[in-house]
Amino acid sequence: MRMSSYGKRKGATFETSVVKWLRLKDILAERLTKAGAKDEGDVVAFLDGTANILELKATKKLDLPQFWREAEVEAENYAKARGLKEVPYKFVIVKRRQAGIDKAWVVEDFEQWTKRAGK
């Protein structure tokens, strides 16, 4: 599905805003280059030296299964491109309408959540 230039601009603005917000919190973060089928996510953020792949969505329509599939594929691409043994944690960040970055929703699956909890 092709995205309109307005949609691309909206997404790019959200990505830039998220990176700036993370940096204000002293979290190392950067936007990742778009690479089509080899896309590695929208943003990488490092927490305690660990890469976290963020798939950002600024859309009216929520399609969490599709968003999550994208995050999984892109985290795998990130790991492959860098020769990492483990795929980084991945998250879908969904912009809430008429709300700031700090009110965005963060989505992950329960399996990853329990892994992060050390279980």
Regions found by a protein language model. Give the residues of each.
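Catalytic phosphate/metal-binding cores of nucleic-acid and nucleotide-processing enzymes, i.e., regions
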Residues: 1-119
